[in-house]
Amino acid sequence: MKLFIYTSILINVINAQIALPTFQGAHKAHSSVSSSGSQTFSYTGSQQTFAVPSGVTTITIKMWGAQGGSGGYWSNSSYCGTGGKGGYSTGNLSVTAGSTVYVYVGGKGESHSSCSERMRQSNPLQGGWNGGGDGDYSYSGGGGGGASDIRYNGTSIGDRVIVAGGGGGHGNAGSSTLLSDGGAGGGLVAETKANNTQYGNRTPGAGATQSSGNSNGVGSTGTANLTGGGGGGYYGGGAGANSTGGGGGSGYIGGVSSGSTITGNASMPDPDGGTMIGREGDGLIVISW
């Protein structure tokens, strides 16, 4: 009898001193926050997309517009003019995790295969994808460069939040001078080249601004002989008189914070490091978070 009592007391003491775990259901997982990263978008000739990672509320955008194309040469010389270089824009965009950002990387305007002889084109040299205007159809000037842009909450032209303008196409040159080169794209006001005084002070295509140029973002097509097409941009660049280059397309930073935009005839960040004067070739976009 005493042994039973002592045993019962010992068991009760042990149970009182051991805290058995209680289970109140599974813990809820913490919301995940994406680590930092970046994604580079090169030219493809079509729309691309970026899916905003989980936990990300702001992305940083760096973009470069495309260069305009080179026209031929009127007087059988080896001089090769150049299309205007593309501009640069950067800024921060507020986003929602899981949403889609629409990416448009501009293409370089089409150039003559050779600038060492007088060349007649059966078709105009084409403007670069995303807004570059065509060169004229006879002794064709170069095509305008396409703009690079980001669109959010839609894919229409009105959904653009940031734009880097493309350069104007080079007009078919009349001498070994720079009088027919295309205007640089980008900046709040894109470049307009000086008049071509070799042929009666002819006026080149006008660089676009925040309120002037082609509101659909497409550069003008060259209609006068030897004329380069306008660059694509927030507003598209113009095309000018005979033997002149197209105007650059303007940049835009109205839909981002901490934004800046630079014309392609000025110093800007080089995506490979350091700085450069304008973007040559196709455009480029880098998104980081």
Predicted feature descriptions by range:
Residues 1-51, 260-289:
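Enriched but not universal
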Residues 43-54, 210-224:
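Surface-exposed ligand/attachment interfaces on beta-rich extracellular proteins
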Residues 53-60, 96-100:
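Extended extracellular/luminal ectodomain segments enriched in beta-structured repeat modules
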Residues 70-84:
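Short, surface-exposed beta-strand/strand-loop-strand elements in extracellular ectodomains
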Residues 83-202:
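Secretome/extracellular-domain signature
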